[in-house]
Structures are given as structure tokens and as C-alpha cells.
């Protein structure tokens, strides 16, 4: 983890995770041993923070261990990106390594530059480890949907061409970062890319093409070996609950109906009275002044508009938090190879030492997917007071707590952060922005519907796209990236609304219990200071805050 790879741990910045079958087996042994130690640890006499840390680690390790018992896929330890497919359009070292080297790997001196090269030299082995696991999964009958493989093959083909000619995304970051450091860094990096990484990528591409020859357009896990079992685990990992697909599907339907009623009020006030809510929302987004130009000028304006929204909310944050984080943030275009299969944006905090800022990675491949309706909500979710903001509080916790994360908390907080932006008045006099906020909430409600529809009810990709577009009013290009993401990460999309709903329910209970003693700043601080936790642990943290507030 960058930011802690100093001193005795400095060697970490030269290495990469072992993604081979042996690496997975080693992680399983670690999880088994660590979980046993945690369960044997007495809780009596420990302070609440330590008890919480033990509960968090035990939950993360138990879920990951259960995931590694499944015959295929990626089961992360305290992270959100669990997937049945080791390599796909948004998963794999072919994407992770370039992004990490570009966005997070520090290059301040010769030692840092050598560490970059060491990681580059380790990349081929990481790629080959993934290829072996992908081949093993194919032998068990697991093949991704054809439409995901088409995106992956196209993106990897472009990456190989770039890496073979100039070094592409593997070399460019080092050439830029080491420009003032004496040494032949870029030529050395290009040689590594050309002689080791490109051949490994070609081997991985050959495996993907072998899978494509067997692939069908079946989108969900229901048609795949042990798919229902994998999806049940994916939902548990993604929501930190045992809620069933049917329950989550119904929850999404009810939430969507409420949000569409609110959207209808805005659209009617704007003179849009004919057609469905989604059709009218689409029409509103086509009005002059809502979109951005094509090409680089549009990309520049999009980034500037996003930055403007971040700048505007900062002065209002003291109304929602007792203690302000730094909010160390920059907006960056995501790697080009990633854009075709990626969402509109995603974000996260920087390094623990603060030297590398948090990022909102924005998809600028097609500027038309962004407009002045959708951007404000997007940056509050990904940036401040969403993922980047929350992540900085987590980094103040003990190291194990800053590393472990739970999808339902992370995404639930970011969705709640969108609500905070509304409550802080960010949409006053801005019907376009408030419509986008409601569209964003509807989008997350639809995720419950579509994710469970694909993986539990046997929906096709076309059925999922039709449901998504009809419900949200988002452009079809956005919908395709979203639906394809749900196909690649079963269960992950359900954590957003489940997490938000739990935070809001806990807030309502705190208000009812505390009455005049309730203060939004204290509630939000309790949710953040308790760290990234499973939802049952979050409920306990909030209960302790309420008890303390009543006692005072």
C-alpha cells in the first residue's frame, strides 16, 4: 500500500501482488491462520475502538476466506472489486499496473525510479499468473459473456500495440516523473515493456481469444458453473448482509418509484409534461447549455466544471462535520485503455503519508456521457464529501483499518454524501443539478433491480439495458458501461443503496432518540470516525455515539 512503504517496509514499493494460483493458495493459508488468531483473541477489557477493529478484521477475513473457497474468480480481502473473472474489461493487471504506476507510484529520486522499474519487471509474472487462473477457470466451464470479452480483447490489443511501439502506459509515467532525475529511465522501461510485458500480454490475449471462441451472450451467473453459489457470496461481500436477491429487487423497485415521482415534479416545472420520466429527463439533457463540446475542448470544460463543484462545496462542509479532513484531491483522466469498459468516473483517497493526493478518475473517452445535469452529483460522490473525503478519515485509523474496506459502507457513504450535498444547499436555484441528483439516486435503485435481474432472474444484457435506460434517463452509452460492469462484478452494485439506506435509518433513529441533543455534525463524525466497517458494526458505532450524547 503506497504511503506505508517506507523504512523497513520500503521494499514493498518494488514488488507486486502474486496473482498466480500459488499466490491465491498463500492468501488462503494466511486468512485461515489470521482468522483463527482473531477468534481466539479475548475481548474482555478492551476499549471499544479495539473491539471494533477486531470485528472489522474478522468480518473481512471470513468473507474473503469463503470467497477463496469458490472454484474461480477474485475474492479480495477488505476491498470492493470481487469478480468471477480474473481478467475482463475492468479487471486485471493489464489495467491495474499502468494506473497504479501513473497515479500512485512516487518517483522523487533514483531509488524511486529503480522501484518503478522493479515493479515493471514484475508485471509479466503477474500477468502470467492471471492467465493461468483464467485458463483453469475455462477448463471448469467458466467463460465470460461474449460482449465483455469483445471489450477486453479490443482494449488489450490497443495496449499491446502501444507497449510494443513506445512503451505506452507502462513507460509514459516514468518518463514524465523522472524527467529531472539523471539516468536512462525511459529506455530501460521501454525495454522491459517490449521484451517481457508485451509477450505476457500476448499470452493473455491468446487465452481471451480462446474463451471468446466458446462464449455466448448469456450475461449472468445463473448459467455458469456454481453461479448461484458465487452470486450469493458476491451479494454478501457487496452488502455485508444476508439479504436475498428477491428482497433487494423489491427494495429497488420501491425506491425507484419514489424517486421518479420527485423527478416528475422538476420536469413539469421545466415545461416537460409529455412522456415517461426517463424520456423527459433525456429531453432535458439535450437542451442548449447542458452538454459540453466534443473533443479536447469539451474534455477541458468537463474537468473545469467538476473542479468548480468541488470548490463550491468546501466552504459548506463545517455545517456537516465537526472535524474537517484536508480533502487532498485532483481530477485526472483515467487511462485510455480503461475508458471503453469503465464508468463515468470513480475516486478514492491518496496515500497515507499525504504525498500523493486522492483522485477522481474521469472517463473522457466520449465527452457526451457528461453534462451539467450529471456532473455535480458525480463529483460529490467520488470526491468531496464522498470517497476521497471519507478515505482520509479512514487513513487516520490503525493501519489494518485504513486498508480494509467494505463496499456497502464505502458506497453507502458516497451515496449519503450526495444527500449531504443536497442538504447543504448545493442545488438551490439549480434544477438541472437537482434533477441529476435524483437521477443518480434512481440509478443506484436501478442497480438493485438490474444486478439481481441479471444474476438471479436470468435477464439478458438487452433486457437489463432497456430497464436501465427506461428508469434513469441516462444516455445509452452510460447504460452500457454500467450494465457491463454489473456483469463483471456480480453483487457489487447492490451495496450502494443498501449502505445509504442503513446510514439514513441510523440517522433517523439517532434524531428520534436524542431530540434536541442531536447534531448532524456529531452523527456524521461518528460514522466517519468509526471507520470503514460492515453495516452491523456501523450500527454498534452509532449506538455508542447516541449513548454518549445522551449521557452528556
Residue ranges and their predicted role:
Residues 1-552:
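N-terminal maturation segment of proteins
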